[in-house]
Amino acid sequence: MLLSDVYATQKTNLFKNRSWAATDKQYIGFMLFIHGLCLAAPFTFSWPMVGLFLVSYFITGCLGITLSYHRQLSHRSFATPKWLEYALAYCGVLAIQGEPMEWVSSHRYHHLHTDTPLDPHSPYEGFWWSHMGWLLDNKVSS
């Protein structure tokens, strides 16, 4: 049927009027602390630190999340020796986006229900929810 996958849903205000689990509060507090440290960056700037940031981003974001969590573990796009699979997965853990099994199961569930009301990081809940808010909610990510 034409346009059968179009949904009309109302935002559920997942951030307001809810009880936050202790793990959610701890994660949010930690993220606020880390981002608060960034306020010191203009006063402590150095080019070696920019280089360290770029290397850290490559290790955690590119190798850990994109290559390991997403391509290797979620989609099984390629295989590596177990020692390398574990090393790459550890790089993903350093990105502070959760444990590999948790991230992979959430991502696979997302692909089962992409852009529907059942999507754990649905765009129907808004830009911030679909990009990062779902990470702050233990009920959605587990």
Which positions does each model-derived feature cover?
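Non-catalytic, topology-defining segments of multipass membrane proteins
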Residues: 1-142
